[in-house]
Amino acid sequence: VEEYIYPAMEDYKVDFVVDSGMHSRTIQLPLKPFTLIGATTRAGLLSPPMRTRFGITHSLKFWDEPDLLLRAEMSCDMLELDYEPEALTLLAKRSRGTPRITNRLVRRCRDFAQVKADGVLTVSTVGAALELEGIDKLGLDDLDRRFLRTIATTYRGGPVGIEAVAATLGEESDTLVDVVEPYLLQA
C-alpha cells in the first residue's frame, strides 16, 4: 500500500499495472493536489520511509480533567441527559484521560441510571455504574489491576517482559501494549 501512496504524496499520481507478462502495461492516474492526514497509535509499525514523508508530526497527550468534564457535559447535552455536576466530575476522573472513554462511560452511566434509577446522573448512580463496569477510583479496570498484580506478585516487581506478562494473563501482548500500558505509564 505504501508503494501506491508514495507517488500520490509526492507527485500527485498513482500508477497501476494492468495485466501480466508481456501484455502488462502501466496506467498512470493523475490526482488533484490533496493533503494527507494520518493518525495512528502504532507509528513504529510504519516503515521509516513512510514516517519521514509526513512533513508535520504531533503526538496527542491525554486530556486533563477539566477538558474531560467539558466533554462529559457535551455528551450529556447531546443525549438530553440530566446530571449533577459532581457526578460528571467523578466520571471525568475515571476516563483515563481519553474523551472517547468519557463518551462511552456517559452512555453506560445513562443506561444504568435509566434502568436502576430515575434516569439522572447522580454521584451515587455514576459510582454504582462504574463499580458495575469494574472501574475503580483511579480509572483502572480489571485488566489493569491484573496486569499490575502480575508484575508485583508473580514477578516480584520485575523486571519482566511484556510477552511473559501476556502469557501469564492469557492476553495478547498487543492488547497490553495498546490498551493497558499507555495509560499506566502516564498515570
Q: Model regions: which residues?
A:
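Short acidic, hydrophobic short linear motifs in intrinsically disordered regions
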Residues: R156-L169
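Short amphipathic alpha-helical elements of helix-turn-helix/winged-helix folds
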Residues: F112, T150-T154, T168
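Conserved AAA+ ATPase core "coupling" helix
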Residues: L45-K93, N103-R104
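Conserved catalytic/switch belt of AAA+ P-loop NTPases
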Residues: E2-T35, L45, I56
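The conserved phosphate-sensing helix
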Residues: E84-P85, S95-R110, G119-V123, L140-D144, ...
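Conserved nucleotide-binding/hydrolysis micro-motifs of P-loop NTPases
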Residues: V1, G21-S24, F34-L36, T41-L46, ...
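Short amphipathic alpha-helical interaction segments
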Residues: G170-Q186
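Winged-helix-like regulatory helical subdomains adjacent to P-loop NTPase cores
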Residues: V126, L130-P159
